[in-house]
Amino acid sequence: PSLVGSEMCIRDSYFFFGRSRRRERIIGQKIYNRLLNKPMVEYLAQDATTLPMAYSRLISLFRNTTQAFPFDGNRIEIYTNGGSMLQSLLRELQNARQHIHIEFYIFEDDAIGRMVRDVLVEKARAGVEVRLIYDDVGCWHVPNRFYDEMLSAGIEVRSFLKVRFPLFTSKVNYRNHRKIVVIDGRVGFIGGMNLAERYMRGFSWGIWRDTHLLLEGKAVHGLQTAFLLDWYFVDRTLISASRYFPKMEATGTSLVQIVTSDPIGPWKEIMQGLSMAISGAKKYFYIQTPYFLPTEQILAAMQTAALAGVDVRLMLPMRADNRLTHLGSCSYLADILQAGVKIYFYKKGFLHSKLMVSDDELSTVGSTNVDFRSFEHNFEVNAFIYDTETALQMREIFLQDQRDCVQVFLKNWVKRPWWRKAAESVVRLMAPLL
């Protein structure tokens, strides 16, 4: 069953040109339209794209709220550890000929960060345009000298929402949690990994388990648009030349939407999409997240799906990198166990993966955690993939991780010590702030 994408062009045009939103008022309607014009033209120029009927409403939701155009013919590589992702990233950076756009929440001054920085410097000195956005809070402890060599090589470096006095400004709440790399407008990276040693080497007590993607194809237009909107936000420079959106032939078979969410628009796009996807699941919906502080909307969707007989599974780290957040996460588990959600604690190390997969058809990977901060306060980005081959790979990754888990059962979970339950309840009150 299918839906022909070209049937929605009129509605696409309305939502593209007709919506008045706070985000557009901040960035400027004309700027917003110009930045989105190139990917829209490429989207409309596609052959009549066959969209999966089961997800036509989800695809429409993302198009109507974030102008996230669904592009087909993409190739996807999945990385489940930092070493393989870093190796691929360095290789693709070395292959850059025209431009590199790179955006991370954390870009650490350590062996891994310096390795990537040195490649960026080398490419900039060879004439490649390089632009970097880092989050000011995520990189709070990174010394200025780390960026000096990049600046001296001609790399344009910008911090996102610079914070001078973190204890006295609300800006500290609104952080850019995105992880985006775009190379020559043709290859992109998106996922949960930042640039720091711990993402590659883990901790003394276990590995760092994460998920990241390489995308090749027109879906990179979505990553490019997200980066250039953020670049305009931090630099007030409009970059929209055609060379940043090259014409491409199909390199694979995956249909992909790049979906962003932020605290300055009227919608909670990724949260709304996940709620719809969970509610629409027919057979199963599997979730990996390092933190589980769900909004009422997500909590209700998970409970309702499980009560309706859908196999809903949640995988969390047994040991987290933030004890408060982990306590808060644990406070919600009885609520979903009672509804029949299966819960697994990953015991091999720290699970930082933000992977979800459903019904062998839909999967998503990105920067978004299942928590208030990601849904309400952060600038986030996810790839939503409508493709059976990719979904089966994601499902196998989840099931492989499940072998390194211990399952949580309600009859045992309710026997936690009273002081543990009390601590969880107190932290839960602070969930929107964590």
Report the location of each language-model feature.
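A beta-strand-loop signature enriched in Asp, Gly, Thr, and Trp
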Residues: 308, 312-358
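A short glycine-/small-residue-rich loop at the edge of a beta-strand within enzyme catalytic domains
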Residues: 265, 269, 289, 293, ...
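A general structural signal for well-ordered alpha-helical packing
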Residues: 271, 278, 299, 312, ...
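N-terminal localization/anchoring segments of enzymes in phospholipid and broader phosphate metabolism
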Residues: 1-6, 10-272, 276, 280, ...
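Helical hairpin unit composed of two closely spaced alpha helices linked by a short loop
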Residues: 281-283, 291-313, 317-322
